[in-house]
Amino acid sequence: MSGWIATSKTRMQDFWSLLTFSSDLVDVKDSGDYPLTAPGLSWKKFQGSFCEFVGTLVCRCQYILLHDDFPMDNLISLLTGFSDSQVCAFCHTSTLAAMKLMTSLVRVALQLSLHEDINQRQYEAERNKGPGQRAPERLESLLEKHKELH
């Protein structure tokens, strides 16, 4: 456990170093003119694309990265750190990204819950059939899917 804590502490120190380094590159009293607030059609397009990117990232990675705590914990820690920045561009952008990330995660959780409910109903329906109508291989596949969803 102590190795995990040391690694976790190092990771957090790296995030704070990155935040400090990034903040030093940008004037804290910036003009407020950054991609999320910049006027113009191309920046409006960026704003929409940025939000879509975060949602698509979660949707595409729902079977791979979301089940691995390491990248998600790091991403959430990074966004949390930047949302506390004195630089408005970092603060607003990371807060928006975090909100889109959480919204997308809720969508994935809802889909998973719906799949679990459907699977449970199908399993119960198949199990309640008479012995002559029941398909053992179907029961087995539904049970496997149930285990996979949990």
Curated annotation (Swiss-Prot):
One matching Pfam family: STAG
Transmembrane segments: none
InterPro entries (alphabetical): Cohesin_Scc3/SA, STAG
Annotated family: Belongs to the SCC3 family.
PANTHER family cross-referenced by the UniProt entry: COHESIN SUBUNIT SA-3 (PTHR11199:SF8), STROMAL ANTIGEN (PTHR11199)
Name of this chain's protein: Putative STAG3-like protein 4
Species for this entry: Homo sapiens
